[in-house]
Amino acid sequence: MPTYFSGFTGLSAGTATFHDRDPAHFVIGPRGMVVDTSLCYANTDRTSIGDAVFAFALEKPTGKGIASITPPAMTGTYLGPLPLYIEGPGHGAVAYVDYDFDEKKFTPVILSPGCDYDETTKVYLPSATVLDGSSGAQECAYTLADNATTGGLVKRGAKALMLYGACTYGGPTVVEAGTLTASVAGATPNGNDLVVRKGATLSLVSDLSVGALQGLGSINGGNVTCTNFVLNLVDAYASGATPLTCARKLTFADGAKVVALDPDNFETYKNGGTVALARATEDIEGTPTLVLPEGVSSAWHVYKKNGELLLTRTLGTTVVFR
């Protein structure tokens, strides 16, 4: 998964010419994207750390990408890997060929399939100009395939990342530290899974519907509806743990379930008491069902009380007749 250090490219907040440097396309491929705001400088002198501002959308791949490349037969002697030149209407494809000196054989490696390529695309292998005196480049055969997958966004670093584009990436949104601000409606895609780690914040300007919801952080600015809630028992029962907190309303969709990532720990915490999994200032609507693996006591269950979703294990009652 590639890591994007926003301050390294000048895509940080505050300069008058910031929008002149916005990329035309910012596509998140199958492996996803990490944005680390730890070194996002607020000024050109790099004397203070500021927030990162993305005025563009983080998009899912569209159209077709480069699926495979077949290099031509060897016509010279090469000393190492070579980049492949890709020309066409699309963008984002990156590939090279490894060269086996003993076997005199090329092995193509596609780092990114790119998107929006068509049959007019050309892929070229540079000729071994220095070694055999030839010039120009040799054309490679290739195949295209529909872009069916897209990764997610992981936000790291203490400073904020502000999104101003209507994003369409299809993977999970993960806020590991600091604040991720969805500054316009759609900046955080609806329907994607959402993880907000302890101490992190997702700030919204509109309501958001997500798939699986997970974490111990905070969500403010909008109502949240989730299809499922993901529970980590170790985190929930940790000393000083606080629940996922929604400043507005949290709604569990019909048929929503609570699923544990570490179900083996139900036995570990069977005497751990009641813990809050989620809290909403404007109440919680809908009641999810706790999924219990085979062999786990049905005494475990979730319920709502005073704007909280609680997990508990009901202890049996012993009646003694005298």
Regions found by a protein language model. Name each.
Residues 140-146, 224, 307-312:
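Short, structured interface segments
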Residues 1-157:
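Feature for peripheral, non-core segments
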Residues 5-9, 14-16, 35-39, 152-155, ...:
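Short, T/G/N/S-enriched strand-turn elements that build extracellular solenoid repeat scaffolds
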Residues 298-302:
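Extracellular disulfide-bonded cysteine-rich modules/repeats
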Residues 315-322:
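Enriched but not universal
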